[in-house]
Amino acid sequence: YQATDEMMGHQYANVQQRVQSTGIILDKEFNYLRDEWRTASKDSNKIKTFGTNGEYKTNTAGVIDYKYHAYGVAYVHENEDIKLGRGTGWYTGIVHNTFKFKDIGNSKEQMLQAKVGLLKSVPFDVNNSLNWTISGDIFVGRNTMHRKFLVVDEIFNAKSRYYTYGIGVKNEIGKEFRLSEGFTLRPYAALKLEYGRVSKIREKSGEVRLEVKHNDYFSVRPEIGAELGFKHYFGMKALRTTLGVAYENELGRVANGKNKARVAHTDADWFNIRGEKENRRGNVKFDLNVGLDNTRYGVTANIGYDTKGENLRGGLGLRVIF
């Protein structure tokens, strides 16, 4: 049984979840460039290179834990008009994410994802303390899987390449309170909708090659949270720290992808790859960001934790504004 089980392609169980989580890495960077780094000019270009890593743990039988490390570049262009906080912009980024599965053979998957989007920001008062932002983006991805599985006492290999694409829309409304000269508190609420599609996956090389039916996911993710910010200036340099806590819940169909596979190049029946359980308890996430910059260049460090998947993550970045 163990031999058959090893061949069943459990690595494909939550492909949709990994595609989404790779996109979320870029989303975090776009948010960071927009929110954490106030601009002096009305017309700004911000660019950041970043690296991040984390892990995902699960108790669901048939779904494999993994670690990931990603790096990439994110860019945001914003035009602000005369009224503070009102503006439009566009953003783009690319991320390369490597997943290392904690299975017997140490399978590996690599995702390359690019995203481009537009945003609009609307203030509801003079000093932009209450602000609504809507953004929409599209993404495309190219992924490779190297599946390694144990049969009796020998490691077998199978390799595949597949593609992803999708579209997302996010609404966020937030209100900033100034607590003192250095401290601010910003409670916010957001709703992100995303549809993603995964192409047919057909393993080209290796033994016991599988074919996985093309599939999709639909994400409806409300989020509510608050950010405590601190700023301190040393002449031209600024230190900014943000501590954020948020609750989000996935109401769509992402984790349990209901993927189906069969042995490739045969007329064998499709079998179900058992997916992750859809966790409706939601996720509580904690984030600490620290940035040091002069008006043009900056370095950033961040650490975060998600209760869902017990994901402890951390990252570093370099950013430039021009």
Could you tell me what each predicted segment is?
Residues L185, K192-G196:
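Solvent-exposed flexible segments
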Residues Y1-F177, T300-G317:
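Outer membrane beta-barrel translocator domains of Type V secretion systems
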